[in-house]
Amino acid sequence: GLVGALFAGGLSVAEVIAYPTWSWDCVWYHLTQSRLIVQEGTIHYWFGPADGSGPLIYANGYPRLVETFTAFHLLVLRSEALVSAGQLGWGLVGAGVVVAWGRRLGIPRPTALLLGAGFLLVPAVFLQLHTTHADVATGSQTLALAYLVFAPKVSRAVFVAAVAVAGGLVA
């Protein structure tokens, strides 16, 4: 399990480095938003004219979190070398949350680690980890939200911090 997860992660990193974004929806939906963020100089590009004549209005109905990470890569590197890396970190978050769920449910640490590694081997995760899709990020965030919501006791400070982070990601 752990060797497979390392292989999956390594292969995804290699694909991010070696190949450009190529799938149709990555290029026409997700990468378009990232480029608009850079072109317009703001993440609020979707607030165009009321008549809908803003740039590429069709891109306005899609998630923006991974696209914002991709725009960050474009701005910092001034290249498209890592535009497909926007979900790699979210894959690790998802694996970590699976480990945390396992520990909360009383599963021994080594088994919980294997389950977390197994998260990276789920076909929907493995096949999209190196793309600009938003599915791995959304799945990881959903697992993390459920972990917090169903916590036996959550301190007020942790709850307020989680709401602040979620609000910052949505804004």
PLM features per residue range, with description:
Residues 17, 76, 105, 121, ...:
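Transmembrane helix irregularities
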Residues 1-12:
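Start-transfer (signal-anchor) and selected internal transmembrane alpha helices
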Residues 115-120, 149, 157-171:
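Membrane-interface alpha helices of multi-pass inner-membrane proteins
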Residues 104-106, 145-159:
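Membrane-interface transmembrane helices that cradle and orient dolichyl/undecaprenyl
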Residues 127-137:
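Short acidic/glycine- and proline-prone juxtamembrane loop motifs at membrane-interface regions
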Residues 66, 70-77, 83-97, 109, ...:
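Transmembrane alpha-helices of multi-pass, membrane-embedded glycan-processing enzymes
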Residues 19-33, 39-69, 78-81:
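Extracytoplasmic catalytic/substrate-binding loops of multi-pass membrane glycan-assembly enzymes
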Residues 81-82, 98-121, 140:
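Transmembrane-helix signature of polytopic, membrane-embedded enzymes
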